[in-house]
Curated annotation (Swiss-Prot):
Its main location: nucleus. GO terms for biological process: maturation of 5.8S rRNA from tricistronic rRNA transcript (SSU-rRNA, 5.8S rRNA, LSU-rRNA); maturation of LSU-rRNA from tricistronic rRNA transcript (SSU-rRNA, 5.8S rRNA, LSU-rRNA). Residues 612-623 have a biased composition (Basic residues). The gene is nop7. InterPro entries: BRCT_dom, BRCT_dom_sf, PES. It comes from the Eukaryota. It comes from Emericella nidulans (strain FGSC A4 / ATCC 38163 / CBS 112.46 / NRRL 194 / M139). Residues 359-468 form the BRCT domain. Component of the NOP7 complex, which is required for maturation of the 25S and 5.8S ribosomal RNAs and formation of the 60S ribosome. Belongs to the pescadillo family. This is Pescadillo homolog. Residues 495-518, 529-538, 545-581 have a biased composition (Acidic residues).
Length: 677
């Protein structure tokens, strides 16, 4: 006879363990258990049936895998947590005795230090695994780098986050790995490609942050501690891969001056500058080959001149050799109904040369930190800004003739309302000032959005569209492509509108205006009110029975209405014939006027235009009805399953088309209002 199984020895009761049981088994406190789970990447699990997993379970009971807790029993960090607990008891005992100096000595000399190196190696066996998990790490570290220091967020933590994030930004600048960026309500999104992995993170805007008490900063501080260690490992590996020393030199004086990225100095492992380790070194054999080829070319040219072969060679068509470049191929669609393939991003060489030939100056009101990072990541080496924004600039002189582009984010104001230059700045000061609102000749002025749109498009856009005070084009997400049949803000209305959509929209607007005008009726006059009251007083509030004469009159009126209804049907049937006759007569008059050499003018030009629009609307309706009938015939030949699938597709396409039509109508009204001004 088989042995009867006991309850709770198999199934969900064995696979899951509650948090209280796990804490008791590990013999640590609940905060230490949370830290340990965050470090090791162990998260709560939800069993299918909580009652089967534990008899006393409620809706708020937290479960973990039993194997995960068994795995934590052998974690070296447990010993550190126990040492911290024992040290806390000793410090509390010393404070209870009044031995403050002994308590301070114990905290300073005997506090155990946690190292997460082995945890990083366990969780990320390969470097690619670490890069894939870098999105959340960068977002949280950039968030803490912009937070104000409080009792929950110490300045030491903020400085550490700023240092590791700036080191990561320097790697992106050196290798031109940044690809896209987007300005959103939440902050600025960035996307970089490192060793084939796309990494995206969010950086908040530099506003005054108000730290609320609703957030548990102890949990976030644990994540920050883990992510700073992870990013330190990643930065070391990235810097080593391109031949740079890690960590880079850090100038405290420049950092206190607000230099930020300029406070770091990159050094190669060998003697020389950092960029030399990045640029492909030209070997001596290549230089020798170039010299030899130049000498050979000179000799060949002399021989050709002596032999008189220049004319003969010019007469023969020569094949132009195609230059071999590292440009990425683009796949263009061959038909409008074909699928659009996702285009590859630009390479690092193209990204590194986008802003290379320019010298930028960032005005005081523009966001310096993101602009400096993006411009440097896309090849710009010369960036200046005002002294108020900090040190480390290429120039602080706004009137420097080397500046080619200036980024301005202020409205265009009349010169009368602009302030004058201070007297101290005009008396031969070190930095020459430019009067606010004035423009330096030969310099291109753009708004900050121009920089973001250029890097997302991978090319330089027209700067006149982004001039100060101009209405900016829509700033769209580079990761969202317009769907087929959807609304595309970048395309014109003429490219997206359907046949007669603008006319239908105009007719609807005119009908709405007429309805609004009809609702505004004049108030009834006193004479009309008196007549109505007299009519009511005749009846005297009594119901009067109808006579036979009244019945006969009502029957005659009904017969007359029936006769008129028949006449209306006949008129409706002959409307098309009248329209054809009118069009034929109109055409005959035009021919006669043309033969006589006189301009044709008709009093009913407006009526003709209205009739023409009406006929076009009828043609469109007939065409649409014909297409619907054809579609119904095709659906009849389908199976039930395919017909249901087609109906679902048509429903979703109809919703998309309706939403696109609403957006186009809204845009049409905006453009019409702007044109009216």
């Amino acid at each position: 006879m088989a042995k009867i199984k006991k309850k709770g020895t198999s199934g969900q009761a064995k696979n899951y363990i509650t948090r209280t049981q796990a804490v008791r088994k590990l013999q640590i406190s609940l905060p230490d258990f949370r830290r340990l789970c965050i470090f090791k990447g162990i998260y709560p699990r939800e069993p299918r049936n909580k009652k089967k997993a534990s008899k006393s379970a409620t809706q708020s009971t937290t479960f973990y895998y039993t194997k995960d807790i068994q795995y934590l029993l052998h974690e070296p960090l447990l010993r550190k947590f126990r040492e911290q607990k024992a040290l806390a008891k000793k410090i509390a005992r010393s404070l209870g005795r009044g031995e403050v100096s002994d308590a301070a000595r114990l905290e300073k000399n005997h506090a155990p230090k946690l190292t997460l190196d082995h945890v990083i190696k366990e969780r990320y066996p390969t470097f690619i695994d670490a890069l894939r998990d870098l999105d959340d790490a960068l977002s949280l570290l950039f968030l803490f780098a912009n937070l104000p220091s409080t009792s929950h967020v110490p300045p030491k933590t903020i400085a550490l986050c700023q240092r590791v994030t700036h080191e990561f930004q320097h790697y992106l600048i050196t290798t031109n790995s940044l690809r896209k960026s987007f300005l959103s309500i939440k902050g600025i999104y960035y996307q970089a490609t490192i060793q084939g992995q796309d990494i995206m993170w969010l950086v908040p805007y530099r506003f005054v942050q108000r730290v609320n008490g609703d957030v548990d900063y102890r949990i976030m501080a644990t994540f920050v501690e883990f992510y700073t260690t992870l990013l330190g490992f990643v930065n070391y590996r990235l810097y080593s891969s391109i031949g740079l020393r890690y960590p880079p030199k850090f100038d405290t004086r420049l950092d206190e001056n607000g230099a930020e990225l300029a406070a770091f100095t990159l050094e190669g492992r060998t003697v020389g500058d950092a960029p030399k380790a990045i640029e492909p070194a030209k070997s001596s054999s290549d230089a020798a080959n170039q010299e030899v080829s130049a000498e050979v070319q000179k000799k060949v040219d002399n021989v050709i001149k002596k032999a008189g072969l220049d004319q003969a060679s010019s007469e023969q068509p020569t094949e132009t050799a195609e230059e071999v470049t590292d440009a990425i191929d683009k796949f263009e669609t061959t038909a409008p109904e074909a699928d659009t393939l996702p285009q590859p991003d630009m390479s690092g060489d193209q990204a590194g040369s986008l802003f290379a030939p320019f010298t930028f100056y960032i005005s005081r009101e523009a966001p310096k930190t993101p602009l400096e990072f993006i411009l440097r990541a896309f090849g710009c080496k010369r960036i200046g800004w005002d002294t108020v924004l900090g040190g480390g600039a290429f120039t602080h002189n706004e009137a420097d003739p080397r500046i080619t582009h200036q980024i301005v984010d202020r409205p265009s104001l009349p010169e009368s309302s602009l302030p004058s230059i201070p007297a101290a700045a005009t008396d031969g000061g070190a930095v020459q000032k430019v009067k606010p609102g004035t423009r330096v000749p030969g310099r291109t002025y753009v708004q900050p959005q121009w920089v973001w749109d250029c890097i997302n498009e991978g090319k330089l856009l027209r700067p006149d569209l982004y001039a100060p005070g101009a209405t900016l084009p829509p700033h769209l997400s580079p990761w969202v492509n317009p769907k087929k049949g959807g609304y595309d803000p970048r395309a014109s209305l003429a490219e997206q509108e359907e046949d007669g959509e603008a006319d239908i929209d105009a007719e609807e607007e005119s009908d709405e205006e007429m309805e609004e005008a009809g609702e505004e009726k004049p108030a009834p006059t006193a004479a009309n009110e008196s007549e109505d009251s007299e009519d009511e007083s005749v009846d005297g509030g009594m119901d009067v029975a109808e006579t036979d004469d009244d019945d006969s009159e009502s029957e005659e009126e009904e017969e007359e209405e029936d006769e008129f209804a028949g006449i209306d049907d006949e008129d409706a049937g002959s409307e098309s014939e009248d329209e054809e006759e009118t069009a034929r007569t109109q055409h005959q008059k035009e021919l006669e006027a043309e033969a006589a050499g006189l301009p044709f003018s008709s009093s009913g030009a407006g009526d003709d235009a209205a009739a023409k629009k009406k006929s076009q609307a009828k043609k469109r309706a007939a065409k649409k009805r014909q297409e619907e009938e054809e579609l119904e015939r095709q659906k009849m030949m389908m199976s039930r399953k395919k017909r249901k699938l087609l109906e679902k597709m048509m429903y979703s396409n109809k919703k998309t088309a309706e939403e696109s039509a609403k957006l186009r109508s809204k845009r049409r009204k905006i453009e019409k209002g702007a044109a009216g001004k």
